Structure formats: structure tokens, C-alpha cells
């Protein structure tokens, strides 16, 4: 702004100097000399002020444009900073001193951590129970109960698998036993039916 003011004063001084130097009039116009000089000076001052105002407006517009451009640039930088993705987090690698575990070892370690966090027992724990004699696994490694021992013991009280034959069964396999269905004596009526010339009215 001070630069523009100095430029305007310089232009004004040059214009006034030219006006005083080139304003040579004859004696007839000597009375109006002061009026002509001031009129020309006023016109030149008006022109100089107009030029200075234009220059000032252009400078101000350029300055405003620069400020606007700087603000726009700062806004773009802020938006770019906001829109930029955060740097990737450093993932903990299982590689220690150049040693990288295999997928099987990684899965085994993951299963151990999972069981530790959830309180689950490994499968080998149950297998050890089953292999141990007298372990608490009633399905795979249990002591034989008394009923099973009775079934394999001769004369045990198991009536289905190992029981003594009843008297009725012994009578059925014994000839002449009192079983009327399997081993009985033929009645007189039956003997008459199979004997020729008997008075059986239904068969003869």
C-alpha cells in the first residue's frame, strides 16, 4: 500500500512539473494563467488518483487472490491429511531370530492359547485317563461290574445267560416226563383214531 502511495506522488509531481513547464501563454491569457494551471493540475490529479485507485485495486485483488489461494491450499492440505489413510500398524511377527514357525506349529500354539483362555482340556488328557488302569472313564476303562462277572461265572444268578435249567425244562427233555404237549402219553381217544375199526364217527 505504501508502495502504491509513493508511486502516485511521483506521478503527481511529474504531471505538475510538466504542467508548469508547458503552460506558456501570451499576455492575453495571463489573467487566466492561474486558473488554467489549477484546472490542468486538477485534471491531472484526478487522472493520477484514478490510476492509483486502479493499481491499488489490482494489487488488493491480487493480494486477496493470494490469500484465498493460500487458504484454499491450506484447506486442501488439511483435507488431504484427514483423508490420508493412517500408516499401517506394525504386525507382531512370529519370526524370532530368523526362525519362522510352520503352519502346524502355529495351529498347535493357537489351540493351546485357545484352551488356556477357555479352560478346555486337551484331547490327550482324556486319552491318558482311558489308558490309565482304573481311570475315571466309565465307558472305556472301567472295572467290570458284579453283573458282568456273574454272567461269565458258571452258576451265576443271571437267569438269561447263565442260569440253571428249571425242572420243567428237564422234564421236557426227559422221556416220559409229565409235559402233556411235548412228551406225553397218547390218550385213549387218540389211540382209537389211529386204530382201524374203532367207533370214531368223525374220521370213519
From Swiss-Prot:
Region (Required for secretion from the host cytoplasm to the host apoplasm): 21-83
Signal peptide: 1-21
Domain of life assignment: Eukaryota
Tagged with keyword S-adenosyl-L-methionine: no
Summary of the tissues where the protein is detected: Highly expressed exclusively within the dorsal esophageal gland cell during syncytium formation in host plants.
Modification after translation: Preprocessing of the precursor by host proteases leads first to the production of 21-mer CLE-containing peptides (Arg-130 to Lys-150, Arg-151 to Lys-171 and Arg-172 to Lys-192) followed by an ultimate C-term trimming to give the mature 12-mer CLE1-1 peptide.
UniProt-annotated glycosylation sites, renumbered to this chain: 32
UniProt keyword terms in alphabetical order: Apoplast, Differentiation, Glycoprotein, Host cytoplasm, Repeat, Secreted, Signal
Biological processes annotated in GO: cell differentiation
GO terms under cellular component: extracellular region; host cell cytoplasm; host extracellular space
Similarity-based family: Belongs to the CLV3/ESR signal peptide family.
Family matches, as PANTHER family: CLAVATA3/ESR (CLE)-RELATED PROTEIN 20, CLAVATA3_ESR (CLE)-RELATED PROTEIN 20
Name of the protein: CLAVATA3/ESR (CLE)-related protein 1
Lineage: Eukaryota, Metazoa, Ecdysozoa, Nematoda, Chromadorea
